[in-house]
Amino acid sequence: MTALDIIIMAAGKGTRMKSRIPKVLQRLAGRPLLHHVLGQAASLQARRVVVVTGHGATEVEAACAGLAGAGGTFDLKFVRQEPQLGTGHAVQQATPALAGDGTVVVLSGDVPLTQAATLRALVEAGAGERLALLTVRLPNPTGYGRIVRGEGGTVQRIVEHKDANDAERAIDEVYSGIMAVPAQRLAGWLARLTNDNAQGEYYLTDIVSMAVADGVPVAAHCIGDALQVAGVNSPAQLAELERAHQRAQAAALMEQGVRLADPARFDLRDDARSGARGEILCAQDVEIDVGCIFTGRVELGEGARIGAYCHISNATIAAGAVVHPFTHIDGEKAGAHVGEGALIGPFARLRPGAQLGREVHIGNFVEVKNSTLADGAKANHLAYLGDASVGERVNYGAGSITANYDGANKHRTVIEADVHIGSNCVLVAPVTIGAGGTVGGGSTITKDTPPGGLSVARGRQVSIANWKRPAKQAKG
């Protein structure tokens, strides 16, 4: 493959999105559209990528900071198109930043689903000497530039929809907005562009007729999958591509043997907070019920079962673990781990730094954050464990909490092995509960407790016989 530079068109306003966010920063699978296209550039091992910005340029450029070479080795540059005078004008702004040799591929920043294999085939069709166009046949080509062919089926020109006559509008083969151009020819063709058309713009597509006039072969690489070249101009189109993308990811998982209760109700997304790409690694016999969302990098061990409507981010679920419905596991940057055979939920919440051992039970409305629970520990109802180290076989009662924050600093609670914590207890950190000990229900523990003992810290019960409740006073 010849040396490759890429221009990405990202100057459009996206008026139909009705959003303050620039169109190319709208998210698909948790990642901005433009990031998907930059990923395509990385897959082609591009030498240099030039992003043409316009509306929201500052935001777009900031959103791409640090992405140069992500998954590849390209040099990332930005140029601004002000004002926006058409696609040809946009490429004119970018060419000074290119090396001037090899092949230049032009991509659209709002076309996120083009496959790397498709782009490689397009580049090969151009071979550094021909002008290669990526085309597709559409049942309703309204709004797209038509591919006009001459005798023998050779491409003669592209005519934009607004400039097309009735015969040309009947053509169903359309230009996708993606092309591969011999770099040494590009500057000369751009210099000959005019804006003598219905839009009063400089069309990049006019270089096709110039190539024909100059005797440069024009190749059309026509694909059958229109979703690969579908752009985003409205929330409805974004939703359509989101579902197409998620269906493809679901299909790939099922090919690996994962049981999805309903592939139409499965989502895998990037994590914008940690920067982790959406990736799910599944062992054999994994089952995922409906409505689950996976964010960032998630590993599911052999026989793991995920109940309906769970949200799992940056976490590892070990073999045989069961996550019951409506559970939220969010490892964020610190990660979260659920051990083999553990039972989680329903309605449980594991936060960053939650590390659960084998056969741990975390029940409904229990929250665990930055805490380690050793094998066999249980917190089955309505409890909070934050900044805690919990030993083996601990039973942590309903309504109990670790008071880990003093208003300025976090402190740890240590609960040693075989401890029984009664219901509605408060463990005020820093504090250690000795091995085998018991804390009586309703206690507020502020000091370390000895191993094997019973610790009770609560007001003494007082019962008053024959006590009369206050009576309501008569009104008026």
From Swiss-Prot:
Annotated localization: Cytoplasm
| Pathway involvement of the protein, from the record | Nucleotide-sugar biosynthesis; UDP-N-acetyl-alpha-D-glucosamine biosynthesis; N-acetyl-alpha-D-glucosamine 1-phosphate from alpha-D-glucosamine 6-phosphate (route II): step 2/2; Nucleotide-sugar biosynthesis; UDP-N-acetyl-alpha-D-glucosamine biosynthesis; UDP-N-acetyl-alpha-D-glucosamine from N-acetyl-alpha-D-glucosamine 1-phosphate: step 1/1; Bacterial outer membrane biogenesis; LPS lipid A biosynthesis
Q: Which organism is it from?
A: Acidovorax ebreus (strain TPSY) (Diaphorobacter sp. (strain TPSY))
Q: What is its EC number?
A: 2.7.7.23, 2.3.1.157
What does the Swiss-Prot or TrEMBL cofactor note state? Binds 1 Mg(2+) ion per subunit.
**GO cellular component terms attached to this protein's record:** cytoplasm; membrane
Name-wise, this protein is Bifunctional protein GlmU
Region Linker, as annotated, extends over 236-256
Q: Spell out the subunit comment.
A: Homotrimer.
